[in-house]
Amino acid sequence: MIAVPSPVATGGLVFLSSGHNLMRPQPIIAVRAEACGDITPANDQRQTEGVAWWRSMGGPYVTSPIAIDRYLYVPLDRGTLTCYEALTGQVVYERQPLGSRNTITASPVAADGRIYIRTEDGECYVVRPGPQFEILAVNKLDETFCASAAVSGGRLFLRGRKHLYCIGK
């Protein structure tokens, strides 16, 4: 297994996902921040003293999840978004499409009460955080994007293959 996605944390939990795992399911695991020692769950176990919840499938390949309030949002490389209840692992919504045939390698960012998810084809999906899947806007730049965005001073910085963009109000 090659761990590509970065861990994220909220509510005393640290969320880990597998990244590249040749021909195997990609798990997502919620580890208690205070856990120590060997906390590996047994084969069919979903919880241990150190693991709050674990799913054998649903982890991202490259992107890092993002945690906002009570929810964990996981964009998958094939252009879908899944939302979990962060503390329990309960699926809120699953594999909601972000366009058709999109590839996502950049990690999402959040700002001003919105989640920004960019595709390699230059589309930026603006999603409302919360239990209902809602795309607020889709913006398109004519460039390839693989790098994660940065947010600073009310501006969104996007590095494309050829240009650096700064988008603000």
Where are these predicted regions, by residue range?
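Noncatalytic, solvent-exposed loop/strand surfaces
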Residues: 1-169
